[in-house]
Regions:
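Extended lipid/amphipathic-ligand handling interfaces
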Residues: 30, 60-66, 199-204
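Gly/Pro-enriched, hydrophobic low-complexity segments
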Residues: 105-109, 121, 149-245
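Hydrophobic residues embedded in beta-strands of well-ordered beta-sheets
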Residues: 69-74, 96, 106, 181
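N-terminal, post-signal-peptide region of Sec/Tat-exported proteins
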Residues: 42-75, 79-81
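Bacterial N-terminal signal peptides
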Residues: 6-15
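Buried hydrophobic packing residues in well-ordered domains
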Residues: 30, 42, 76-77, 104, ...
Length: 254
């Protein structure tokens, strides 16, 4: 009888273990919260602060379309300030390009290069982390979220597997119950902390609760902060031609 009970208990434990999601599955679920599964556009507003005072701002329109393999291709159109209106950035596969209509030239960019404040070029492109990083579960712990509330989280350690990944490694904290992204720390190849980000202000956008703000704090100077706001989500068709470098001079938003 004891052996039967032990066998039954062992089966229960094995079943629970097999049902637990892997770190990679939790990362993919977190991606599904940050990003819609279909082609879409949204407005991205960047605001840079130094010691609590606004020093710069920029408004962009992002067009993102999922590609075979699950990653996104993104076209970014500069809207404000007026001096930058009409400029474009394109991320497709392992290439990123900047196009200036003034001189009608496109130049290759690094995703790691700063766009404004603490936001890099790669930060404004729509990216599924699960396609560029391998995840391992590092800890389960309670942290303070972007609303200064305690949150029980799984800490995932992400290591880059794609050559075009914006960061060498990332520590990502996701809500232990919902897989919502809560906090991230981004590291360079040298393991130097580049920035810390908090995902907050969850709202329903395109059928799911998604973070509509990301607060990015410099890794060396906590007084240097960039706020990214995401709004005006819209599901829409995005022609594949828009996502080709040769088409950039002919791009006209509809």
């Amino acid at each position: 009888m004891r052996s039967l009970s032990a066998l039954f208990l062992g089966c229960l434990i094995a079943g629970a273990t097999s049902a637990a999601p892997s770190a990679d599955e939790m990362l993919a679920a977190s991606d599904d919260i940050r990003n819609p599964s279909q082609a879409f556009s949204m407005t991205v507003t960047l605001t840079e602060f130094q010691a609590g005072k606004q020093v710069d701002a920029s408004t962009l329109t992002s067009y993102a379309r999922p590609q075979p393999g699950g990653q996104f291709a993104s076209l970014i159109r500069f809207v404000l300030p007026a001096r930058d209106a009409g400029k474009l950035m394109l991320k497709h596969g392992n290439e990123m390009w900047f196009y200036d209509p003034t001189n009608k030239a496109s130049v290759r960019l690094s995703p790691q290069q700063r766009l404004m404040g603490q936001a890099s070029n790669g930060d404004v492109a729509t990216v599924n982390f699960s396609r560029d990083y391998k995840a391992t579960l590092a800890a389960t712990e309670t942290i303070q979220d972007g609303e200064r509330q305690p949150r029980r989280t799984h800490k995932l350690a992400l290591s880059a597997t794609a050559p075009d990944a914006t960061y060498a490694s990332i520590d990502l904290w996701i809500d232990a119950d919902s897989n919502r992204p809560i906090k991230a720390r981004f590291f360079a190849d040298s393991e130097r902390l580049l920035k810390t980000a908090y995902y907050r202000r969850y709202q329903t956008q395109l059928g799911a609760q998604r973070p509509t703000e990301t607060v990015i704090i410099d890794g060396l100077d906590p007084q240097s902060v960039t706020l990214m706001r995401f709004s005006a989500y819209a599901a829409r068709a995005i022609p594949e031609a828009w996502l080709q470098r040769d088409f950039l001079p002919r791009f006209k938003p509809d």
